[in-house]
Amino acid sequence: MSLHVFANFVTPFGTAANNRAETEGNITTLQKLLWQGETHSTVSAEAIRFALRRRLGAAEKTNRVWDEALRSNVWQDHQFKGWASEKGVTFVDDDLLGYMIAEAAKEDGSDDGKGSATVRRAVLEITRAVSLTPWAGDVTFNAASPGATPSAQKKGSNPVPYGTEVHATRYQYGIALTPDRLRDKTRAAKAIDALCNLGTVAGNHGRFLFDFSPDAVVLRVTQDPAPRLLYCFDTTDDGKTVVSPKLLQRLAAEDLDPKELIVGVSDLECKLAADLKARQVPVYGVKKACEEAVKRITAELKIKG
Amino acid sequence: MLGVYVTVPVACFRKGMAREYLETEPLPPPATCYGFLLSFVGETDRRRHVGARVAPVLLNKPPTSVVLRTVWRVKKMPLGSPGNTRPDYQQLLTDVKLVVWLDSSAESGTEPTLEARVRAAFTHPSSVNRFGGLSLGESTHLVDEVSLLEGKKADSISGQVGRAFLLAPKGRLSLPVWVDHVGSAGTRYATGSLEEMTLPTPPSADRLPIIHHSP
């Protein structure tokens, strides 16, 4: 058997200028994609992984540590030597998020000149976050104080005007985790805990704080290899509240077993909670749901958490 | 022959030769579908089911978006050195719905065949020992739904017209059936074309691209 843990998270409502695309003129743009026929803003999985790695650092030492002063990553073991032996020292971020050192082929087209790769596949996989509501085209007009952006200010001491695309919305994203593949299985609990307490993801030079700690989460602990809950959240009132007709449909179709689901919501009286309770899905607060999932994983894997 | 219904919310089936601009194929190449099926049944030896025939069928017309992303390459050690990352554009497809046809009649490996193993994985998921999220292409591009194209699922798409990648000697599309990741000398392609077909009727088995590698 293989135990799979899947989850879909949705953030609280906030003003986002996360994950910028290429600047157009003096407008800092958002990353966008077409989603169900409309333009939605999006945040990469890499940005979520970056924030998660920093969060994991609070629980255990990580291999990659972001140095604010150097503005780059500092590595403890960039050749991943700890993985060579069974008892080697390994880091929580490598264990969960994987790594790769790839060396390009010296000479293409021949077997002799083949490249090499030292790879550990991620045990925890994360999808791209997509906004719950379409982007309406909001742009803020700003002016940097005189002297604040010397590179943009070619001459004189006037303020530098610029625009920022912003999106007032929620984001949703999913994860897949096979805890049995971890070198240290107690790290599954640390991953779930970090995801349920994730803070800022991406962001715009600290001008915006967009909270990625989930407002609602649906977790699934199962032997089915397909999540069947990715991007399951929706809204009928421009993101004010969260609903999930997709989840209800799948429960009705018996594609999802309510016994495998754990739902966490910040408002226990909300419609989402009532709809799911009516389908025999256990509903808790977000932190309690996280604890419940950890309890189930720990029991299934018979590990000491 | 077996049909597997698959949905992928966000995907990029990167063209093998794409470098600065990461273009996507319209649908996952047979090699990608084969890898996905191996992952589904927990098989780590990719030569185990050589000879399997795999054909993807696209059920909808996923819109294409373009995002800017960080692409890694190792120019300098250690890995965190500046210059090892660069921003590049990537095409993304959203809301991809597929059927993957699988036929094991020409497989050369030992029994059970991939077809039998995929069927067994649907009937008894607890008998499968596998790991990792199921994905088509990059691991970020997680698959959401996987179902056997039988019974209610087959009825739900009955009459829909999909576009299948089928072998055609003078076809306009070449997609890999085997990818050599370290050096590309061993990469093998199948030539075919995208043909409209009504579901859930399977195509003729001899038109399905066959998974093969260089000796």
Please report, for each region that a protein language model flagged, where it lies by residue:
Chain B
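Sparse, context-dependent recognition of short Cys/His-centered cofactor- or disulfide-binding micro-motifs
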Residues: C12, L22, V41, G83-P87
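Glycine/small-residue-rich interface belts in oligomeric ring/scaffold proteins
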Residues: M17-L79
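N-terminal, Lys/Arg- and Ser/Thr-rich interaction peptides
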Residues: M1-A18
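Primarily extracytoplasmic ectodomains and periplasmic/lumenal surface modules that are beta-strand-rich
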Residues: A11-F13, E43-T44, E107-G109
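Residues in well-ordered beta-strands of folded domains
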Residues: Y5, A55-V57, W101
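Generic beta-strand structural signal
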Residues: L2, V54, V96-L98
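Internal, well-folded beta-alpha domain core
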Residues: L59-P215
